[in-house]
C-alpha cells in the first residue's frame, strides 16, 4: 500500500488556495431563492425533519427514503430558529462540499501522490455537479464525502477506520453500502480485519440511523418505492439515450474533457493493477453497475464517481498536466452556472404576489417545484412521470368543483410535459387549455433552461 508523505507547506498552501476557490464557487448562489426552499425540492423533505429533531420531535424521522446522518448533521444549524431555516442548512451543505474537496486531495495523495492529490482537489472544486449540490441541503454531497474518505482510508491500509467511514457513507445515502466491495478488495488476504471492518461499518450505520433498523419493514417499503420510481424513469428524461450513454453525458456535463483524462487514468489503472488501482476500479465498477437499471438520469447520481475519476486523471505528471488544463472547461461552466444563480427567482415574485392579492381563505393548487408546501391552503398536484397515474385535478372543471380557486404552474413541469406530450397526452391537454386563459400574474426571467424561467398564477373560479 502506498502511504503519502506528510504534506509540505507548499502543498498545504496549494490546498488552501484550492479550497478558497471552491468556497467562492459554492457560497455565491447558495442564497438563491431564500427564504423559500427553491434550489432543490428535496430540501423540503430534509430540513424540516432536521429542525424537528432539535425542537422536540424526537430522533425518529418517521420517513426512510433516506437514512438519518444528514438530519443529524443539519440539526445543530436549526437551533435558535422558530421554523426551518434553509439558509442555515445550506451553510452546512457548503461546509460538507468543501470537506469533499479536501477528501479528494487526501484520496489522491494516498493513492498516487502529490499530482493526483492536486488534480483530485481541483477536479472536485470545479465539477459543475459538485458545485451545484454543495449549495443544497440534500444527501448527495455528504454521500460523496463519505465514499471519498472511505476510499482514502482503504488505499492507506486502514481497514477498520474505512469500515466506520463506509457505515457513515451508507447512513448518508443507501448506495454507500456498495463500499463493501472495495473494502473486501482492499482486505484480500487479511480476512480478520475485513470482518472487523464490516462489523464497524454496520455499527456506524446503526448508531447514526437506528430507526431504519428498528422500523426495517417501513424502511424497506420506502427504499423499494424510491428504487421503483428511479427505475421507471422521471419527467424530463423520456428522450434520453440508453442508461450508460445518458450517465456518460451527465459525467461530461460535470467534468467536461477532464472526464476523458480520467478515462485514460482508468485504462492505466486496469493495466497496472496496484492495490490502490484495484480499490478505485472495484468501486467504480460496482457503482456504475448499480446505475444500469436506473431510468431517472439525474446528474447527482454520478457524483460519487467524480472524485475517483479526478484522482485517476492525476496519477502521473503528464496526465496531471493534461487534467489541470482540461479543468478550465468545467471551471468556466461552474462560473457561468453560478452567475445564473445570482438572478432573482421568478417564484419569489409569484409567492409575494399571492401573499398580497390572494385572500387567505382561498385554496391554491400548485405544480411541484413552484411554491413550497408549507401554506396549509396549498394543494400540491402530483408530479407526472412514467408509470404514474394521471392526477384528475389537472382539469379546470375539477379544480372548480373541489373548491380550488387558484392555480400555480411553472416551466419546470409544464414545459417538460409539453416536450414529452406523446408520453403525457392528458397532462399536455391540460397545459394547452391554459393558453386560452389570461394569467392573473406572470413572472418571467430571460436566460437558459438551467434555472426556472417562468411561473404563472391563474384565477380558476369564473
Name each model feature, range by range.
Residues 133-134, 140-143, 169, 174, ...:
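Hydrophobic/aromatic-rich transmembrane helices and adjacent perimembrane loops
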Residues 27, 322-344, 366-380:
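Transmembrane alpha-helical segments
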Residues 390, 394-462:
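Aromatic/acidic, Gly/Pro-rich catalytic loop(s) in extracytoplasmic/lumenal soluble domains
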Residues 14-19, 104-126, 145, 159-161, ...:
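Transmembrane-helix signature of polytopic, membrane-embedded enzymes
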Amino acid at each position: 500500500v502506498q502511504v503519502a508523505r506528510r504534506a509540505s507547506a507548499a502543498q498545504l498552501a496549494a490546498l488552501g488556495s484550492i479550497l478558497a476557490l471552491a468556497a467562492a464557487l459554492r457560497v455565491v448562489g447558495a442564497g438563491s431563492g431564500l427564504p423559500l426552499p427553491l434550489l432543490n425540492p428535496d430540501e423540503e423533505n430534509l430540513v424540516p425533519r432536521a429542525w424537528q429533531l432539535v425542537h422536540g420531535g424526537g430522533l425518529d424521522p418517521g420517513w426512510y427514503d433516506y437514512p438519518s446522518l444528514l438530519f443529524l448533521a443539519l440539526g445543530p444549524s436549526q437551533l435558535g430558529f422558530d421554523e426551518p431555516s434553509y439558509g442555515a442548512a445550506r451553510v452546512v451543505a457548503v461546509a460538507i462540499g468543501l470537506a469533499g474537496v479536501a477528501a479528494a486531495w487526501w484520496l489522491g495523495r494516498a493513492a498516487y501522490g502529490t499530482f493526483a492529490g492536486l488534480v483530485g482537489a481541483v477536479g472536485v472544486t470545479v465539477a459543475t455537479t459538485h458545485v451545484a449540490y454543495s449549495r443544497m441541503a440534500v444527501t448527495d454531497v455528504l454521500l460523496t464525502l463519505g465514499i471519498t474518505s472511505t476510499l482514502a482510508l482503504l488505499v492507506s491500509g486502514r481497514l477498520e477506520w474505512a469500515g466506520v467511514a463506509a457505515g457513515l457513507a451508507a447512513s448518508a445515502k443507501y448506495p454507500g453500502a456498495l463500499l463493501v466491495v472495495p473494502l473486501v478488495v482492499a482486505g484480500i488476504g487479511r480476512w480478520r480485519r475485513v470482518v472487523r471492518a464490516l462489523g464497524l461499518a454496520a455499527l456506524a450505520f446503526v448508531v447514526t440511523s437506528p430507526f431504519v433498523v428498528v422500523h426495517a419493514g417501513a424502511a424497506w417499503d420506502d427504499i423499494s418505492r424510491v428504487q421503483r420510481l428511479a427505475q421507471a424513469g422521471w419527467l424530463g428524461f423520456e428522450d434520453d439515450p440508453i442508461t450508460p450513454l445518458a450517465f456518460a453525458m451527465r459525467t461530461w456535463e460535470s467534468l467536461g474533457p477532464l472526464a476523458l483524462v480520467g478515462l485514460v487514468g482508468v485504462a492505466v489503472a486496469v493495466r497496472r493493477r496496484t492495490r490502490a488501482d484495484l480499490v478505485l476500479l472495484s468501486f467504480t465498477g460496482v457503482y456504475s453497475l448499480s446505475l444500469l437499471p436506473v431510468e431517472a438520469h439525474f446528474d447527482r447520481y454520478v457524483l460519487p464517481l467524480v472524485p475517483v475519476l479526478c484522482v485517476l486523471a492525476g496519477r502521473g505528471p503528464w496526465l496531471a498536466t493534461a487534467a489541470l488544463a482540461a479543468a478550465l472547461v468545467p471551471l468556466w461552466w461552474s462560473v457561468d452556472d453560478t452567475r445564473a444563480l445570482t438572478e432573482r427567482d421568478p417564484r419569489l415574485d409569484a409567492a409575494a404576489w399571492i401573499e398580497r392579492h390572494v385572500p387567505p381563505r382561498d385554496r391554491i393548487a400548485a405544480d411541484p417545484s413552484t411554491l413550497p408546501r408549507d401554506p396549509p391552503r396549498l394543494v400540491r398536484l402530483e408530479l407526472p412521470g412514467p408509470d404514474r397515474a394521471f392526477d384528475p385535478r389537472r382539469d379546470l372543471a375539477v379544480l372548480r368543483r373541489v373548491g380550488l380557486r387558484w392555480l400555480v404552474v411553472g416551466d419546470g413541469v409544464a414545459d417538460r410535459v409539453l416536450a414529452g406530450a406523446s408520453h403525457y397526452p392528458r397532462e399536455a391537454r391540460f397545459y394547452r387549455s391554459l393558453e386560452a386563459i389570461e394569467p392573473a400574474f406572470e413572472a418571467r426571467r430571460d436566460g437558459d433552461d438551467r434555472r426556472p424561467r417562468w411561473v404563472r398564477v391563474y384565477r380558476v373560479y369564473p
